[in-house]
Amino acid sequence: MHLKRSFAVIGGDLRQRFLLRQLRGLGFPAAAYRVPDTEDRAPDLSGCLQGANVLILPMPALSGSGVPLAEILNAAAPDALICGGMLGPAEDALRARGLSYFDYAKDEALLLQNAELTAEAALSLLLERLPGPLAGSRILICGFGRIGKLLARKLKALGADVTVSARKPRDLELAHILGYRRVTTGSFADALAQYDGIVNTVPAPVIGPEQLQCVRRDCALLELASLPGGFCAQAQALPGYCAARGLPGKYAPEAAAAIIRSAIFRELNLEEAR
């Protein structure tokens, strides 16, 4: 399809503001509703959606827009494409209405690019919280997915002594091949006392109250995973604990917006430059 694209950007954080600016900078008609720090925005939802055939919700889509999903569905044009991150249960409602949708949080390129931004921000947070210099510090990374792999590489390049915690044998073997120490998740025993920093990327319990007793009080604890996270609730009382979820939107919102825009453009078969 080669329809003229007209965008409506709804709610969200600074990523949505930068996304709106980028779309307008590329010459696309783009209206805004409840986008923060944006003066030129529609007074109501219906005004924002008038003539729009691409609706862009934030990530997460349902809790971040500030607008009930039912209102958006009722006001959207029948031929509109609804774009949002982590649509989840909204997909059923969209299908029931016969509306087209795109969950950009499932786009593999976006996930990799967001992981890179997350790893960069996590590195900065670690530098602020480690009890000593990064070079020579012993860092445990729980989980060896996209973020874990990228962060491990950055830390090792800067001289950290990196240990990777994983459950799958192939992940443990890959960690070994790449030059990291390795340990099976859950088999920490008293070894946690050796680490200067522990970074969790696993959205499931990893370090419980019993394991936490072995962690030094000056250890930097960085929680990157979505809820429920990997650290037990007691970890939050430790001075080195930091809940650092959603880092791309907080530390690099303009770059994160460009990543979202690129994912949507790929879905629409649009060129980056017009």
Residue ranges, per PLM feature:
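Glycine-rich adenosine-cofactor-binding loop
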Residues: 7-18, 23, 135-156
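NAD(P)-binding Rossmann-fold cofactor-contacting core
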Residues: 26-41, 158-178
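A glycine-rich, Thr/Ser-enriched phosphate-binding loop motif common to dinucleotide/cofactor-binding enzymes
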Residues: 108-127
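Rossmann-fold NAD(P)-binding glycine/threonine-rich loop
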Residues: 85-105, 225-269
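Helix N-cap at the beta1-alpha1 junction of Rossmann-like dinucleotide-binding domains, i.e.
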Residues: 14, 37, 169-170, 226-228
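Rossmann-like adenosine-cofactor binding region
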Residues: 60-82, 175-251
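N-terminal ligand-binding/catalytic initiation module
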Residues: 1-93, 97, 101, 263-274
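A short, basic/flexible loop-to-alpha-helix module at the beginning of a structural domain
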Residues: 1, 123-134
